[in-house]
């Protein structure tokens, strides 16, 4: 039993409630970043500044930020990316990179882009400063993460205003979002998950199956519950948490074991008679399909799957399982027999109030293309094969 499994993250109940307007502001800000627009970010002390994502930044964006704020911008990257660039030691959080002169868009791209080699030339005078969790720089990187972009942003404080953050943002026609709302967003969105549709969908080998779709209030990606048979609410249910994998699930790609795990889990649940598979919108261990393809390209240079994520600036695994716990509760289950090899799933579910009464191993043979991937999961991520 794993009820007391540790976790480094705060429990969901430790986060103060967020109103719908704040959630909408974060959602709109992620969309603006994806379009290459600047957004205004307000920190807890009431100060404000502007940020734009590195991935979608235009050549003239740095100069526009200078004109908007009256300050020289910095490049905000994750500590993982700064470590890859040999600018800081191992750690977590966000780092601000700055120059004695104004950083250029090309320099920002070179420092944040996954194709930039760790041993490449650094601009003269480049300095790296670790930022506080509540900083504008940290919020900007978190916002880029939410937008499924590279976790890097060009950020500058506003030095040309004396009014409120809202007044400054309105004056410059920028969307305004608070740093604390960005930090808490993922927890709050989970609380708004609602079952929006359900239908009977007979599957090959599991004809008595229905699929329920859960959608958050921000209109974000839906998570699916594939319910096989008639599991009894209130009793421990045979369950599998499966993060979507376009290449493995749909295309039968051989670089991972996801397709085997998906189809194998449904077959095992059908043999058992009943259970639920949660199909979670967390492509690429939470970094999104585009970034997963970037990670594959990096792996082709000889790096493993963990190194590839870190070269991109991500953690080895960016997934959270709050949505899974919420879906299980809404389906009537607070205890599971969990089909997994991943100890982090056990820890996170327990942290979210779901009792794991048994771990059911879920192992499939290597195919010749994914041997290194499976070995890395065991040796570096602690998977139990």
UniProtKB/Swiss-Prot annotation:
Its cofactor is Zn(2+). Signal peptide: none annotated. It catalyses: GTP + 4 H2O = 2,5-diamino-6-hydroxy-4-(5-phosphoribosylamino)-pyrimidine + formate + 2 phosphate + 3 H(+). Binds 1 zinc ion per subunit. SUPFAM superfamilies: RibA-like, YrdC/RibB. GO terms for biological process: riboflavin biosynthetic process. Residues 1-189 are annotated as: DHBP synthase-like. GTP binds at residues 240-244, 261, 283-285, 305, 340, 345. Pathway: Cofactor biosynthesis; riboflavin biosynthesis; 5-amino-6-(D-ribitylamino)uracil from GTP: step 1/4. Its EC number is 3.5.4.25. One of its GO terms (molecular function) is 3,4-dihydroxy-2-butanone-4-phosphate synthase activity. The active site is at 317 (proton acceptor), 319 (nucleophile). Residues 190-385 are annotated as: GTP cyclohydrolase II. Keywords: GTP-binding, Hydrolase, Metal-binding, Nucleotide-binding, Riboflavin biosynthesis, Zinc. This is GTP cyclohydrolase-2. It comes from Azospirillum brasilense. The gene is ribA.
């Amino acid at each position: 039993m794993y009820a007391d499994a540790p976790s480094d993250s705060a429990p969901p109940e430790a986060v103060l409630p967020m109103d719908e307007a704040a959630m909408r502001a974060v959602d709109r800000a992620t969309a603006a970043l994806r379009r290459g627009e600047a957004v205004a970010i307000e920190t807890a002390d009431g100060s404000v500044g502007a940020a734009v994502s590195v991935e979608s930044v235009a050549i003239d964006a740095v100069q526009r930020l200078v004109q908007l704020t009256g300050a020289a911008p910095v490049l905000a990257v994750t500590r993982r990316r700064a470590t890859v660039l040999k600018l800081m030691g191992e750690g977590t959080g966000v780092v601000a990179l700055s120059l004695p002169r104004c950083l250029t868009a090309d320099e920002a791209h070179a420092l944040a882009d996954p194709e930039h080699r760790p041993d490449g030339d650094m601009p003269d005078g480049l300095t790296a400063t670790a930022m506080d969790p509540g900083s504008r720089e940290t919020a900007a990187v978190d916002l880029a993460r939410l937008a499924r972009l590279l976790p890097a942003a060009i950020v500058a404080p506003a030095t040309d205003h004396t009014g409120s953050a809202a007044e400054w943002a309105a004056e410059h026609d920028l969307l305004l979002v608070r740093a604390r709302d960005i930090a808490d967003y993922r927890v709050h969105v989970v609380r708004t998950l609602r079952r929006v549709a359900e239908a009977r969908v007979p599957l090959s080998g599991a004809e008595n199956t229905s699929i329920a779709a859960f959608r958050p209030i921000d209109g974000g990606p839906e998570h699916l519950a594939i319910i096989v048979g008639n599991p009894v609410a209130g009793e421990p249910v045979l369950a599998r948490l499966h993060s979507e994998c376009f290449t493995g699930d749909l295309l039968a790609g051989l670089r991972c074991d996801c397709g085997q795990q998906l189809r194998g889990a449904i077959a095992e649940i059908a043999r058992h008679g009943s259970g639920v598979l949660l199909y979670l919108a967390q492509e690429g261990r939470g970094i999104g399909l585009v970034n997963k393809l970037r990670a594959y390209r990096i792996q082709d240079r000889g790096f493993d799957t963990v190194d590839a994520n870190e070269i991109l600036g991500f953690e080895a695994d960016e997934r959270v399982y709050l949505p899974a716990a919420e879906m299980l509760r809404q389906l009537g289950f607070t205890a599971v027999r969990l089909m997994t090899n991943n100890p982090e799933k056990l820890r996170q579910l327990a942290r979210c109030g779901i009792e794991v009464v048994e771990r059911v191993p879920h192992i499939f043979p290597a195919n010749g293309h994914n041997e290194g991937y499976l070995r890395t999961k065991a040796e570096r991520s602690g998977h139990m094969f």
